[in-house]
Amino acid sequence: MLKRIRAIFQIILLVIISIATSVCQTNNKTTALWLFDEQIGFYPSHVLEDFSDNNIPLVLGLGGQIVEGKFGNSLDPINQERISLPKGEEEFGLKKMSIPAGRTIEPLSWHNAKFAAFMTSGENHLRKEIGFRKPTTTKLNLGDFDWTVDFWFYPYRKTFEEGVLFEIGTGPRGENNYITSISLEHDLTNFKLVNYASDNIIRLQTNLSMNEWQHVAFVYDSRSNSLSHFINGKKLSTVQNIRLKELDIGDEDYMSIGRDCKWQKQFQGKIDELRFTEGMLYNSNFIPSQSLSPYTNITQKDSLIKGPILLAENRNNTFDIGSRKHLFIDNLLIEKSENIKFVVNPPRKGEVVISDIEGQFRKHLTVVEDEKGKIRIYNSAEKDYLEVFISDDGINFTRPNLGNQIKGNNNYCILEPVGGLGNPFIDPNSEGEGKWKYITGYHSRGTYLYTSPDGFVWKRMKLALIPFRNGTQSCTFYDDQRQLYVSYHRTGIHHTPGLATERASVVTQTNNLLSPIIYKPLSQSEYINIDKKERIRDPLPWWLDNGPLTPGDWGKEFPVKFKPDVEDPIGTDLYITKAIKYPWAPDTYLAFPIVYFHYYNDGPITRHELENPKRERGSGPIETQIAVSRNGLDWNRFYRPAYVGIGKHENYDMKTAYIAQGMIKRGNEIWQYYFGEPHYHSAHLKYDDKRAVFRLIQRIDGFISIDSPYSTEAIIITKPLLFKGNRLMINIDTEATGYAQIGFLDTNNNPIRGFEIDNCVYINGDFIETEVEWIRTSDGNSNYEHDNYENLEAFNNIITSSDVSSLEGKEVKIIFRMKGSKLYAMQFKNKLD
């Protein structure tokens, strides 16, 4: 019996041991995971993302390319296409620098940035804004603790010297041998680990096959002081009795992937999914896992919500408007008109809703109605973290307690430097963890997607949606009529005639926000050709603009859809687009561009004088205008009156007016909000205690109207239409002494019996929605004599009708006759008598 128990125990023990031998303890922690899944053609200076929780980014250099990989893409330490470098500033790496006294290595610039992938806390003469980590303070600094380094490798070239997989050093770069590195000898027979701190140089025999993907792993066991090497899960070699040591923390520490610190010793092939782990992942043979790309439980509906076909895409002479509401923001449906004008209707300025602003407070606000009908205002404040205010009535806003306290306030929902560079919105195509979305800049390293189940707790997708850095708020909306997510992002690639930055916006479109948006890389020669036709700022190519350690700004890779035009004063910027799809009528896209009038560079000296510090102004004032579109891409901007101008408001004398992204519907009103300051952009004299957020009140559908003059009648005849419904409803304001009449015509412009414009009951008054009526005699005859009624009894012979069902589905035109009136919108509806 005892022997049987002992045998069973031995079997159990063997099972436990066998389970433990292939994959080690479960408390392993990923230090860094670079998937290198950025797009092929990825520009140098742009960020290679770390998919661990430690946020350790790299940047791509002139000595590396993103190419096809084992899983997605990979890093190949081969040179980028050669470019001719323009002259420029030291900060942006365009000036070749002399070797400093006491050193031997030329400081980093575009002239020598031949690294493949790199991070550094040195090279501080350059612009560095992406949040590099100090590698010697992390577990990338391999030493006397359990660790694993593994990756997929595709060797396809042999070299005359060893090739470096990675090198980490205390710095200054290239000035000493204080490094830890793993390299592959030139004949591909041995890997070599160099650990300066422990004075170890360790060779591990390998067995690589050329032109094949292989999984490579190195595992250090600090208990046995051994280092093992695996190929495709098979242990090939182990070195015993070594004691590694971490490097000292360096003031100018760095890490280079694919080359050494002098950008030499090119690794012999492609690297995919490079991972550093604190802990031993393997201690015996194993089967390599598939891709390490993290699984996400954020999903998008298989079929995107689809709205009606855009009227603007109509290819026939007849427009089938069905029962959709039509806002008169342009002449899309107009065939002929006389004496009309499209007019901007600025909102009524309401009360202050957020005041007593202290400290940092970004101008770029977003207003959203949440699932419970509460109104939220998002913006960034301290440290560029995102905060939120909440209101039941849209007037009294409070700070919700989200448990993230910064300087006494608990309403912060993203504790990362996002700068308010996006607009949180509810995605109609997602539920659960991805219901809320926020596309924003992050750490000046690119444009990223954040997701949230409730708009309070957010998570950033690791891979940038687009790798270009944001300088201000990106504006995103879902277009149900084109089934695309549309985003506008500011670019500064153009310059004014006076060589100042001319700000405009590019547009991106995608049907899947969970995957990066791919762009077509532009070569230097392509940029030079563009520069012959447009005023393009130096340097060319544009991705050089921030230096080799900070990503480039938005360039010509995406179409520019919002920019200053010939009507604007010279030296005017379109700072932010603020584009939306109007939620309460199809075919209607509105933008509220923030327009910035520069005092400097352009125009005469009499204009430049306004920036004189003695005047205590600044670089210029800012207003909000309005633009309209029928497809969200092609815009018509109205210059005057300004939609939200500068001037007096609630005892504030505002010099800048930044409207918030988004709007709220309450009854027959649209509420918008804006941030105002009583000082100028780049102010010489600031009044930070007088900054405030205000409510704006707009008539529903009332942004633009067709106005008719007071002195004479105006006429509008539409193009041929098909409609669905039995009533024609009009949003109109005639004031007291204006009026309108409406009739129907056939396609030959003949009046349709019973719906003649002369028989239309005068529309007189202010109506959000009023039925159009026609009069007839009691015998049904509409051909009565007008102006023939001298007493009230005559009206007994008159009946009115608003029923247009007899015209439903027939090709008709609508004729409007107006005087002293504003026409906003129309809609056919079905209504029971």
Where are these regions (language model features)?
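Beta-rich carbohydrate-recognition and catalytic domains
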Residues: 297-576, 581-654, 673-833
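Localized edge beta-strand/strand-to-loop motifs within extracellular or lumenal beta-rich domains
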Residues: 212-227, 819
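Short, aromatic/His-centered strand-loop micro-motif at the edge of beta-sheets
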Residues: 191-215
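Extracytoplasmic low-complexity segments
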Residues: 23-127, 240, 284-312, 338
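Glycan-recognition/cleft segments
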Residues: 163-193
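Short, solvent-exposed beta-strand-to-loop segments that form ligand-recognition rims
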Residues: 231-253
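Aromatic-rich beta-strand patches that line glycan-recognition/binding surfaces
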Residues: 46-52, 150, 160-175, 257, ...
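Extracellular glycan-interaction patches encoded by glycine-rich segments
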Residues: 122-124, 249-273, 280-281, 286-287
